[in-house]
């Protein structure tokens, strides 16, 4: 048994190292793509915007009318978003099917119907969203309407899941657990699309890395130092493993964030009109800045206050994300224990199913997406679906 555990631990360590190497490779690729390929979906030129300015020659009446995505790239970005939406919609169907099939195996038609509903809701919600983003105007009013619609979709799905499962013979607790798990998977899929397309691929990769780091550190240190069980539903998990998992993740992810988005001051960019008057424009967001994209921390202050704010906010959010990753792992482990299964499916062979691989990530992505939704409705400066862009043109 010890030999098997040691072998498994080595495999997990190898996977973790490989993921870090791949992440660094992607960062290098991103740097070259942003520097030399204007067609890159995450390049500076691809995200450039046209700023429309209205001025009567008086500083008091000078204002920015609007800032729109460059028209040459709207169709390409919409097509890119469409591909991501369709792919994640398929993932949503598979995740829901694995979850429902584990809880009520003998109801294939019900499983298929609920799974397809999840995929339809994902694609039906996000395709119109990207159409508005790239071919219409995403303003504060649209932002509120979208947020209300998103909340309505969650309530609708919860009601459908609860009502549908009430007609079959399962325990009420399993009924609630399934509905909760299915809604979380739905939010995670919407969040994955959002982070991948709107915030850049590095952000979704970083969120998945948080889940992988937490799981890996918790397992390795738990096997070595674990003595006190964390919770009865998962005897193999210990408090020591959870502590080192969270601590190791906070250190690792914060280092990655620092290396890839060095905390320099970002001044409010200004543009001068014909009368040489400086006009304040919106914050100049970096397409791949992990701190602003994931944690929504804007570098607009200086001195010691800036560094304290940066470190406290970043570390607190990474810590919270790691806790949610552990919660996701425990939640889906609890479902497997209740249903007496080892894996949700054999879709990925020895690695189990999609839910087995992304159980922790689904919780933390859902957390960060809800965090972004709340930030989007509470701040007038950063709308939820406003892409991170550079402002490079004036008309």
Swiss-Prot record:
Short name of one Pfam family: CTP_transf_1
Primary location: membrane
Keywords: Cell membrane, Lipid biosynthesis, Lipid metabolism, Membrane, Nucleotidyltransferase, Phospholipid biosynthesis, Phospholipid metabolism, Transferase, Transmembrane, Transmembrane helix
Pathway(s) annotated for this protein in UniProt: Phospholipid metabolism; CDP-diacylglycerol biosynthesis; CDP-diacylglycerol from sn-glycerol 3-phosphate: step 3/3
Disulfide links within the chain: none
Keyword Membrane: yes
Protein's UniProt keywords contain Lipoprotein: no
Reaction(s) this enzyme catalyzes, per UniProt: a 1,2-diacyl-sn-glycero-3-phosphate + CTP + H(+) = a CDP-1,2-diacyl-sn-glycerol + diphosphate
GO biological process: CDP-diacylglycerol biosynthetic process
Membrane topology classification: Multi-pass membrane protein
Transmembrane segments: 13-33, 78-98, 115-135, 144-164, 177-197, 201-221, 242-262, 306-326, 358-378
Record-stated family: Belongs to the CDS family.
Record PANTHER family: PHOSPHATIDATE CYTIDYLYLTRANSFERASE (PTHR13773), PHOSPHATIDATE CYTIDYLYLTRANSFERASE, PHOTORECEPTOR-SPECIFIC (PTHR13773:SF8)
Protein's name according to its UniProt entry: Putative phosphatidate cytidylyltransferase
